[in-house]
Amino acid sequence: MAYQVTTFYHFTRLNCLAEKQSRWQELGDRLGLKGTILLAEEGVNATIAGESAAIEEMVKIMAADLGLTSVPQRHSWAKTIPFQRMKVKIKPEIVSLGQPQVNPEKQVGTYVSPQQWNQLLQDPDVVVIDTRNDYEVAIGTFQGAVNPCTKKFRQFPDYVKNNLDQQKNKKVAMFCTGGIRCEKASAYLLEEGFAEVYHLRGGILHYLETIAPEESLWQGECFVFDERVAVQEGLKVGSHALCDHCGYPLRVGDLAEIRYAVRHCPQCGLTVAVSNEL
């Protein structure tokens, strides 16, 4: 049996957070769903997994609680549910940039479809930036994209000030896993006075789901924050596992007959047993 994995986010001003937390936690548990839902005054960010009908009911009720008829979602599949339990958490931000003046509900950059994205990547006048963390970029990114070498998203404003402040009149295009980080980053750049800011609608996941492999400018795999670790074209489960010691993503390789292989983590140097049961 395959389980559905659904991700979505929405920037909107929310109140009664504790009430929504309690209601959604109870609902997710009752429907047998697992995953993580982050709630903040700026909106909601969710990844949930389970049976399709249960997810459909959960999302429908959540959308109604948010005053929406529907929310844009990304769907993929996994052989097992890639979460241990359902967690609904209240946070200061649904994605932590540390810039309280930034309001994606007020302004964001220009959305670019996966079909249009390849044109931007091949435009020499466009600065293409991967807004994800360094360990995510290490296993896959777009051709020609700049890696800011950040350890966490909160470091992105410092990268902008140190590297992009003199390029405010240039076209800047950004991307991330599912769209939420580059959407907030685009709002930040506009707030800082950048003239033309673009971001990939639906993020890498939408691109991998939409663009045929022979047309794709993606290289490698896309890190995801669940037990699948990474996905590839068509959102199929990738070939990475996490280091038991430091959490760095390791490539498993083609181990057709061997269930476990000993590897040395290139990040921390410790020996780790990597499971090939993806």
UniProtKB/Swiss-Prot annotation:
Renumbered to this chain, the signal peptide range is: none
CDD domains under this entry?
A: RHOD_YceA (cd01518)
Boundaries of each Rhodanese domain copy?
122-216
Question: Which molecular-function annotation in GO is an example for this chain?
Answer: oxidoreductase activity, acting on paired donors, with incorporation or reduction of molecular oxygen
- What is this enzyme's catalytic activity, as reactions? uridine(34) in tRNA + AH2 + O2 = 5-hydroxyuridine(34) in tRNA + A + H2O
EC number(s) per entry: 1.14.-.-
Q: Which GO terms describe its biological process?
A: tRNA modification
InterPro entries, per database record: Rhodanese-like_dom, Rhodanese-like_dom_sf, TrhO, TRHO_N
Q: Does the keyword Oxidoreductase apply?
A: yes
Pfam families per the UniProt record, alphabetical: Rhodanese, UPF0176_N
Family to which the UniProt record says this protein belongs: Belongs to the TrhO family.
Its function?
Catalyzes oxygen-dependent 5-hydroxyuridine (ho5U) modification at position 34 in tRNAs.
Q: What is this protein called?
A: tRNA uridine(34) hydroxylase
**What taxonomic lineage is listed for the species of origin?**
Bacteria, Bacillati, Cyanobacteriota, Cyanophyceae, Synechococcales
